[in-house]
Amino acid sequence: KVEYYRPDREAKIMRRLKGANKGPLADESLVHLMREVISACLSCEKALSVAYLGPEGTYTHGAMRKHFGSFPEGVPCHEISQVFRHVEGAISDYGIVPIENSIGGSVNQTLDSLSTGNVKIIGEVTIPIKHQLLSKGKDLSQITKVFAHEQALMQCSSWLRENLGSVELIRTSSNALAATKAKGDSQVAAIAGAEAAKIYGLEVLAKNIEDSVRNSTRFIVLGREVPNTSGSDRTSIMFSASDEAGSLYGVLGILA
């Protein structure tokens, strides 16, 4: 257990901060500043180790920084299941993984790992998803392949069909990994966030190519123990039902 990290206290501090805010800064800006202060203070004790779906530059990496600030030691993992193993095995203090996208729906790898793993959901963070088409080259007409995570391909399917209908679409385990594929070939493009363009030195061929402007992804924070209540908490319930008529009704009846 990480004694010096108290997410329940942080949540109360953030609520008080927003309640007392009369401007000129927006609540989100104040919370971001305080998050960085807390993150820096925690690092003076010992930097938190947080496993995330990597490599650096993924949306999960961005969600980690939004939730924990800039000072934790990020541990990039190749697969969602690896994040769970890092937390379960105490290799990392915490983990963060995507669980649901407003367009693509649930992330099945996360649900599968939740059903078999022994970790707790201790927090959540939602971030807007803005997809960019990135490449080493600068000519959209020269692109022959597009690498991206399957969720990104789904979320940009209309744009891809209209603008790159004849190119080969190749799935990767993360959008940042897709960006690394685009680094060495001007005829290859990747779908990723703007941060990935900076990290991997790529040009933005097209901005905001997602099919819906309301595209967002919810991430869950994983830990080995349930933290104290903050006064603004949620409970997650996961269950499976048999494939027969009335099974879902029977389960929901327990909660009614």
Where are these regions (language model features)?
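Domain-level signature for soluble enzymes in the chorismate/prephenate branch of the shikimate pathway
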Residues: K1-A256
